[in-house]
């Protein structure tokens, strides 16, 4: 961390957890186990120490959003209607975005009773493999040009204006958009949008996804640490795919394990690390809230925008 974070308060885990005194985690160990991603070591103590204070902070931002919306409606002499509260979550592959997103979805739904909380990943806005192949950029999958950013922005605008939207579904098992299937998002009270690209600028530099976010989170760690988690996850995915020929990762189980891991290291070095350093990490200071992880996914520091 450097002067890039001059506009952030740096808060240790010990100081952060003292900002919230509740000792009940709002979920059980079994529920936490069911939502955490492969090789993510999050535990109930992390929920109490990190995520319950974060929920309190989100409540503050939510009240601020409601007050501003109400005041603007009075000023403009327009009818006030409740817009969804949109949370953007970004970070590298394998850093734990999905676990954080699913956990927040559960905690928000239990904190804001009767609220409709939707979770969407930007994977659904990747171009189908067929189009990536046609454009000669299948090896750039995950990079900015592999996403249909216009459709993603249109989706956010639709949701922000209280209109039901239908979006594509991505499957990690087939490594592609699922044909002829759509996810329906019906006017949520909260929308969590998770993906590596949620803070990135658009090519025309006229529209910015951040403009639609009421709160934003970046999950950070040292790059060598993320590489270790990526390789651990790759190995776990191979184990899951071993008996399933339809799984994208099954083909990697047909070569010697050391060759598969060499391939994974090459994918990390030539694709994921390049994407992280060039396109993902430079956007982290656009977040309102940065979660920094050390070894074993242990959250050691928080950065909160001033």
From Swiss-Prot:
Species of provenance: Streptococcus agalactiae serotype V (strain ATCC BAA-611 / 2603 V/R)
Catalytic EC class: transferase
Protein's cellular compartments: Cytoplasm
Reaction(s) catalysed (UniProt annotation): (R)-pantothenate + ATP = (R)-4'-phosphopantothenate + ADP + H(+)
Keywords: ATP-binding, Coenzyme A biosynthesis, Cytoplasm, Kinase, Nucleotide-binding, Transferase
Gene name per UniProt: coaA
GO process annotations (BP): coenzyme A biosynthetic process
Gene Ontology cellular component annotations, sorted alphabetically: cytoplasm
Protein name per its UniProtKB record: Pantothenate kinase
């Amino acid at each position: 961390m450097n002067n890039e974070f001059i506009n952030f308060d740096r808060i240790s885990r010990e100081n952060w957890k003292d900002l919230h005194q509740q000792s009940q985690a709002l979920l059980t160990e079994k529920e936490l186990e069911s939502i955490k991603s492969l090789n993510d070591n999050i535990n109930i103590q992390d929920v109490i120490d990190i995520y319950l204070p974060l929920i309190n902070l989100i409540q503050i931002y939510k009240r601020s959003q409601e007050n501003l919306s109400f005041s603007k409606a009075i000023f403009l002499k327009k009818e006030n209607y409740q817009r969804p509260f949109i949370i953007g979550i970004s970070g590298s592959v394998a850093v734990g975005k999905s676990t954080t997103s699913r956990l927040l979805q559960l905690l928000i739904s239990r904190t804001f009773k009767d609220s409709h909380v939707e979770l969407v990943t930007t994977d659904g806005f990747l171009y189908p493999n067929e189009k990536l192949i046609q454009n000669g950029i299948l090896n750039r999958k995950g990079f900015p040009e592999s996403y249909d950013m216009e459709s993603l922005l249109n989706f956010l605008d639709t949701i922000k204006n209280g209109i039901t939207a239908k979006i594509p579904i991505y499957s990690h098992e087939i490594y592609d958009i699922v044909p002829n299937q759509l996810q329906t998002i019906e006017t949520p009270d909260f929308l969590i949008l998770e993906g590596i690209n949620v803070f990135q600028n658009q090519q025309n530099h006229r529209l910015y996804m951040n403009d639609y976010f009421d709160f934003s989170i970046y999950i950070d760690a040292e790059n060598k640490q993320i590489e270790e988690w990526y390789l651990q996850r790759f190995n776990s995915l191979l184990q899951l795919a071993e008996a399933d020929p339809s799984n994208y990762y099954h083909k990697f189980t047909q070569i010697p394990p050391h060759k598969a891991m060499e391939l994974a290291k090459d994918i990390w070095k030539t694709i994921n690390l390049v994407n992280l350093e060039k396109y993902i990490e430079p956007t982290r200071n656009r977040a309102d809230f940065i979660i920094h992880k050390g070894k074993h996914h242990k959250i050691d520091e928080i950065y909160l925008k001033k």
